[in-house]
Amino acid sequence: MFKAQIRPGVELRLLEERHAAAAYALMDGDRDYLRQWLAFVDKTRSEEDWRKFVRASLEQFAATEGFTAGIWEGQQFIGVIGTRKIDWLNGKVELGYWIGRAFQGRGIMTDACRAVVDYAFRELRLHRVEIQCAAGNARSAAIPQRLGFTLEGTRREAELVNGKFYDLLLFSMLKREWPRMNTNEHE
């Protein structure tokens, strides 16, 4: 997968160390916005921190435990999407994502999620994809809803961000549900 066009001019590319400067600049520019939802933002203080994250992501990829891809519009880095915790025994994976504030509201992340979910079911042959997001993050929650995921429930105070516990919404999609959902436009 690790260069996949998701719409004209927008593609996913496996995150590499050479992307650290662009990724850090985007995250740092949106730090105040992103830090309310993502615990890693306050711990990521430099390009070197990003390089460490990328190295760990590449190790995860090499071990077939997940991947992290940058989202690119032309030559501009605009966000991140990835899988983690691939559970091969039970055929499931968790999907996570974030996009720069200036690129929100255009359906790019929905298209990116659609591509990764399709990859998880068709290429990795997994049975289940999960998405978790903060209950108060309406933009993030709208993505799995648009893609036809089922809201399974709320994990109460399941994530600590900035010294505050947040409830997480848990969404899931099963492989047998995906072909039906993937045939419709959800934008």
Where are these regions (language model features)?
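Conserved GNAT-fold acetyl-CoA-binding loop/helix
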Residues: R35-R55
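Acyl-donor (CoA/ACP) binding surface of acyl/acetyltransferases
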Residues: M1-A22, L26-Y33, T68-N182
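Short, polar/charged, Gly/Pro-enriched helix-capping and turn/loop motifs at alpha-helix termini
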Residues: W37, V41, T64-T68, H127
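Generic alpha-helical scaffold signal
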Residues: E17, D28, T44-R51, E65
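Short loop/turn motifs at secondary-structure junctions and domain boundaries
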Residues: E59-T64, F149
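Residue-level detector of secondary-structure transition/capping positions
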Residues: D28-R31, D42, L58
